[in-house]
């Protein structure tokens, strides 16, 4: 399975606007966390899981969010397809399946991105695989200011 972007829609009337993502099912979500970067173009990558699934929603600003499918977490190939998504708050929610690593870079100064996870924190840390932020590099073409 590949990452899926569940598109959001909206309806406006004289009261305001409602944004919705009706095709999305979050029944497997057990926790959430939000990230805000101090510097524009901060790269936070790569964070992978064999078991855990992620759903990603931009709450403020614009982000480049990327995901790579990993066959071998102990010896990953750096010559694999990078799934790239440029997301804003109105674009929808990105689903990242298990056996993927993901990363994000904020493209705006004011920014906020929310992650939804399918595992409790104590189980997630046992399924946590970190890779150097430049191991797969979709970021450099956008001149990042900081890699984490």
Each language-model region and where it sits:
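Short beta-strand His + acidic residue motifs that chelate non-heme Fe in jelly-roll/DSBH
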Residues: 94, 102-107
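Non-catalytic, conserved peripheral segments adjacent to functional cores
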Residues: 1-90, 109-148
């Amino acid at each position: 399975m590949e990452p899926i972007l569940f598109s959001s829609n909206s309806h406006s009337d004289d009261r305001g606007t409602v944004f919705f993502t009706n095709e999305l099912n979050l029944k497997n979500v057990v926790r959430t966390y939000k990230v805000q970067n101090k510097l524009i173009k901060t790269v936070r990558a790569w964070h992978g899981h064999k078991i855990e699934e992620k759903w990603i929603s931009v709450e403020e600003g614009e982000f480049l969010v990327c995901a790579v499918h990993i066959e071998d977490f102990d010896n990953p190939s750096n010559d694999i397809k990078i799934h790239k998504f440029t997301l804003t708050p109105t674009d929808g929610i990105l689903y990242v399946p298990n056996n993927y690593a993901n990363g994000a870079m904020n493209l705006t100064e004011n920014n906020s991105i929310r992650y939804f996870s399918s595992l409790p924190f104590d189980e997630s840390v046992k399924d946590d695989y970190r890779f150097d932020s430049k191991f797969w590099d979709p970021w450099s073409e956008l001149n990042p200011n900081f890699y984490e």
